[in-house]
Every structure is written in structure tokens, then in C-alpha cells.
Amino acid sequence: MDQLHHTMPFEVTYRVMRVSRVTGMETGRFDGILDGGTISRNQDTSTVESADLEYHGDISEFGADLIRVWADLTWPDGTSESIPLGTFLPDGPQRSVNGPNSTTPVSCYGRLRELSDAHFAQPLSVPAGSNPVDVAASICRDVGLEVLPYEPCPYRTGSSMTLGMGSSDSESTKLGAVNSLLTMAGWVSARTDPMGRVSLKPYREPTEQATAWVFTEGDGARFCKEMTDERDWFDVPNQVICVYADKDHEYIGVAVDDSAGPYSTRSRGRVISRTERYSDIPKDKTRAELIAMANDKAAQLLVESRSVIHRLTFTHIYAPIGVGDVIEMHYPTGHVDGRFAIRTQTLHLTAGLSVDTEARYFERS
């Protein structure tokens, strides 16, 4: 879908296909899925994607295959397009029975669930000098997932490390290991594309990313005029206290924003503090140098703390964008204008294929 067709009316139908886990190929239509349902994407959850559908019948004997949801769109100019919306593991443990009829709510999980369900039978040793992204990709492939081509990663591990030890999910599951390796390299957590393939990408600030889609008020607008425009500014600190301490000594640094800025002590009329404590005190510095270091750290943290989450929640007609993508919103009537990175999406599998989107941007004063 391009920007031109996005402004045109369209008809949409949905189909759910059965996908062989062995070959990755679609083997036929999975009939019986009732109209409606949702697909959710959330970059703050480990498996990112999920879906809720309803099936006419019993899905308990579905087997190991996957399902893939498609939207088939047709425009008045005769153009048509089939858009994959997600590939999932279906689960329907509970069936509602009414005489000979029955329906099953189907909870669907993105394919990263296969990594989160898998633990290491033996700890995995990663030698010093390894490419952590290559190791992460190898772990994904070992559980049967396809990994899309990714950029070269220049980072190398400085020392050997062992994965798969510990009791928490981030330490024991293969998804936890993959995301730890990606974080080490400065990459975003693993995600999947609508075909169920794993996508590995380096992290880039929204200001460094190209705009994926533009929403503009006017005749071609395809977003609802009612939206939520929110800024979380109330708790932004205007004083930071930095404490370096061990059992014998304590060195305190303080930074205060008393400028004319919107979050300063002068503008707010009160002090809003944040305190950070550190125990790693350098041994080769004088008391004056340590106090100066604490003051410098407090000043650095004060600058970093002066950020406000500008959050935009709105509904729009489907566009080919996903979590992490940067969008522009130009809505003069509502006094909303800016660039935002998508955090969550909920796709409604109904007429119009509407999407509830939350996007945000960190504003620094």
C-alpha cells in the first residue's frame, strides 16, 4: 500500500492460512475463523506480537502447524493487494458448547514465543572476540526460526561469557539470551515480520530514522480526529543529588535547574529531586576531585532527566508501518504536529482495518 491508495476507499476481506512448521509453506486455508478479532503489537513485551481470534469448532487437534493472517484489499481503480498481518502459534484450550455448535477463543502468539519457551539444556559458552549478533542469530536458527539478512555488526565481546545460567527468564530462556546479546551490541530486541521471520536491527534514535509514514489533516486524511495528546511532565526532576559512598566515606554532588526553563525550580515553584547512589569510588582521586566528579555526574543526570514523554494515541486506517517505525503527524486543527516512534498497535480485523496506535517521543528541555 502506498500513500495514494491509502487515501482511497477500499474493500477488505480476511483469510487465515495454515502454515507447515516443517516447510514454512502455506498448505491451505484454515476455515472456521469467525469475523472480527484483533492483532496486537507491543515493543515493550518480549514476544512483541499476539492475536485474539474466534474459531467455529474445536482447535485442540490443530497440531504443530502455524497460522498466518492475511488482509486482501481491493481499490476502485482495480488495484488489489494481499497484505500479511502476522504469523502465529494458535492456542485454544477452552471450547464453548451450545448443543451441536461450539466456538473456541483462540489466543495466538508470535513466533518469538518459541524462543521464550525454550531453555538451554546446557550452558552456552561464547568466546571472547565473538560477534554477539551472529550468536543471537544462530540461537534463533537452532529453534527452527528463519532470520532475515541483517547489517554487519562491528562489536566484539571483550571477554568470554556463559549464557543459559540463572533462574530468571532473561538468564535461562533462549529469547532472554538473544536479547541480552543484542543489547550488548547496541541493537534492539528481536522482532518478527508478518511472515514470522526474525528481524535483527541496530538501535537508532528516532531522530536518526527516516519517516516511515505521514498522517496529514485534509481531504486525504485517514485518521480519526479524536485522539489523546499527552505529556508526562509532572515528575520531571529539577534537582539531582549524586552520592558516591562506601563504608568509610561519602561524597555528594548536587545539580539544580534554576533556569527560566519550563521544569526549573523557578518555573515550578518547588523542588523535585532525584537521588542516585554509587559505590564504585576511584581510589586515586583527592576529596576535592571526588566531590567535583559527583557534581559533574549530577549535572549529567540532570540533563538526561529533563525529558518528557510526548505520547500520542490515535486511530487510523491501516498503513504499512509497525512498532519502532517513525511517523509524522500534521493535525493543525488539533494543534498536534511532530515526529513520533510507534510503541504499540492494535489491528482490528473488521471493515476498514482500523488500527489503534500509540506513538511517543522524548522531548528534552
Language-model features: locations:
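Acidic, small/polar-enriched beta strand-loop surface segments
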Residues: M1-G24, N179, T183, V188, ...
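Hydrophobic beta-strand residues in large extracellular and virion-surface proteins
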Residues: V12-V16, A51-L53, I67-A71, P90, ...
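Intrinsic-disorder/low-complexity loop/linker signature
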Residues: T23-G24, S46, D77-T79, P152, ...
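Oligomerization/assembly interface segments of phage tail-like spikes and tubes
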Residues: S40-D58, S102-E114, C242, E276, ...
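Short intrinsically disordered coil segments
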Residues: I67-W70, A121-P127, F215-G220, D257-S259, ...
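Charged- and aromatic-enriched interaction segments used to assemble
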Residues: P100-R231
